[in-house]
């Protein structure tokens, strides 16, 4: 993948029953380098069961944490706050957790390189409740402007906005979505690239939760308690 030199775009995560987190879209950060390492998912079972996509092991966390020179407990703290107690990145096989944001879609649909819609887009089968609601909104938007819809959605266990696809080391938002839909291991890799390329990694290394949460979750992080929640989560996993 080609290198990226760009400013961190705004990251917004709407409050959800799954992630239990929200943030504002007014944070910025500086790109300090480009991370290209990608862990492939060649060892997952061939069957299309949920276990094919979920189930990060301690070894998975350890491999990425070692490369980033950051504590495993620090990474897990972010997962807990962004993905909730279940710490999962998928609602069903091949169906990642998403949060569609209409304001972000309206902003980014005009910026999409490919503004075509996918008239054949379908809502994944078997979803209910909040998952069905979010995927229905995303699918309806995809029928109008597929790339814009993907850019205006927050993806996976780390709730990374699709508009940040380049900062995750992807050439296109389509590639970003494909990787997000492959496994939690790929979601972890995308997160690692994201925090490296946006300059957030030093804050996570130092466990400077205020600085990290301000960049990751926006200026209202303190009012929403992101920094204290991450600190408490870190303490939990550090035991």
Each predicted region: which residue ranges?
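Catalytic glycan-binding domains that act on GlcNAc-containing polysaccharides
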Residues: 23, 42-239
């Amino acid at each position: 993948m080609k290198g990226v030199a760009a400013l961190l775009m705004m990251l917004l995560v709407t409050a959800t029953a799954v992630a239990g987190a929200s943030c504002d879209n007014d944070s910025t950060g500086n790109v300090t380098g480009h991370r290209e390492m990608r862990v492939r998912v060649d060892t997952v079972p061939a069957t299309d069961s949920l276990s094919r996509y979920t189930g990060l092991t301690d070894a998975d966390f350890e491999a990425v944490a070692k490369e980033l020179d950051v504590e495993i407990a620090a990474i897990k703290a972010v997962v807990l706050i962004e993905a909730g107690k279940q710490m999962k990145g998928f609602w069903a096989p091949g169906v990642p957790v998403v949060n569609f944001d209409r304001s972000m879609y309206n902003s980014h649909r005009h910026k999409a390189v490919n503004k075509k819609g996918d008239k054949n887009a379908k809502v994944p089968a078997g979803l209910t409740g909040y998952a069905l609601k979010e995927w229905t909104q995303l699918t309806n938007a995809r029928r109008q402007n597929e790339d814009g819809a993907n850019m205006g959605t927050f993806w996976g266990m780390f709730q990374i906005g699709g508009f940040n696809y380049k900062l995750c080391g992807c050439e296109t938002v389509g590639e970003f979505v494909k990787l997000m839909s492959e496994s939690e291991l790929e979601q972890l890799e995308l997160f690692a690239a994201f925090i490296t390329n946006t300059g957030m990694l030093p804050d996570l290394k130092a466990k400077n939760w205020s600085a990290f949460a301000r960049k990751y979750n926006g200026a209202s992080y303190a009012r929403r308690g992101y920094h204290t929640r991450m600190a408490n989560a870190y303490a939990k996993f550090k035991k």
